[in-house]
Amino acid sequence: MAAAIPRAASLSPLFPLLFLLSAPQDSSGLHTKGALPLDTITFYKVIPKSKFVLVKFDTQYPYGEKQDEFKRLAENSASSDDLLVAEVGISDYGDKLNMELSEKYKLDKENYPIFYLFQDGDFENPVLYSGAVKVGAIQRWLKGHGIYLGMPGCLPAYDTLAGEFIRASGVEARQSLLKQGQDNLASVKETDKKWAEQYLKIMGKILDQGEDFPASEMTRITKLIEKNKMSDGKKEELQKSLNILTAFQKKGGEKEEL
């Protein structure tokens, strides 16, 4: 009969793994699902590996409504192959966690959270987000920079058509794209037809009123949401309308920071 192996000896190879699993998640104190915590070392390793990286700079232990909005955004990023969401926790006391990055980007802690969008590994020219810390507003801003995230009311096929419509230079080309969208309605699910028709309505308005219609309509709807008391259902419908309107903004446009 084989000699019995002492229990402690049989478990010894697992000790390092068990130690790692029982250790704190990371030194920054951040545990947001869908977001990658970065420090002064990993920041420079990770940013170049993704086409787009949205980085939130914040206190070491963020909380409250703005952090809740960020959590929703981080989870929603699962729908994008091009976008990585990350966060950097900063502390100006004790070990002065990640202060090097705070100084590099001239961050003011009174303005936390601060969002920067890095593209193609460019550390020197990130784009600052200056809108409201609301998941819908940030996603619309990202969409304006060519980053697609699944948003309520939006239909990928019609988002693509809207992009082609805005890039088209002549009236005839735009009319042709409008007709294409109308012809495609037959294949749209019944539950989505209302929103597909809204894309077509916006195309018609642009043909009639010009390029400024999407931006002015977004401003109008945003003011309605902010100032008027309305049911949650009505507010949700208006938010979907805002989401659809962003498909008609030229890539890199920043007018949607509302």
Curated annotation (Swiss-Prot):
Does not seem to be a disulfide isomerase. Plays an important role in the processing of secretory proteins within the ER. Pfam families: ERp29, ERp29_N. This is Endoplasmic reticulum resident protein 29. Residues 1-29 form the signal peptide. GO terms for biological process: negative regulation of gene expression; negative regulation of protein secretion; positive regulation of gene expression; positive regulation of MAPK cascade; protein secretion; regulation of endoplasmic reticulum stress-induced intrinsic apoptotic signaling pathway. PANTHER family: ENDOPLASMIC RETICULUM PROTEIN ERP29 (PTHR12211), ENDOPLASMIC RETICULUM RESIDENT PROTEIN 29 (PTHR12211:SF0). The modification Phosphotyrosine is found at residues 61, 63. Coiled coil: none annotated. A motif (Prevents secretion from ER) lies at residues 255-258. It is found in: Endoplasmic reticulum lumen; Melanosome. One of its GO terms (cellular component) is cell surface. The keyword Nucleotide-binding does not apply. InterPro entries: ERp29, ERp29_C, ERp29_C_sf, ERp29_N, Thioredoxin-like_sf. Keywords: Endoplasmic reticulum, Phosphoprotein, Signal. The gene is ERP29. Homodimer. Part of a large chaperone multiprotein complex comprising DNAJB11, HSP90B1, HSPA5, HYOU, PDIA2, PDIA4, PDIA6, PPIB, SDF2L1, UGGT1 and very small amounts of ERP29, but not, or at very low levels, CALR nor CANX.
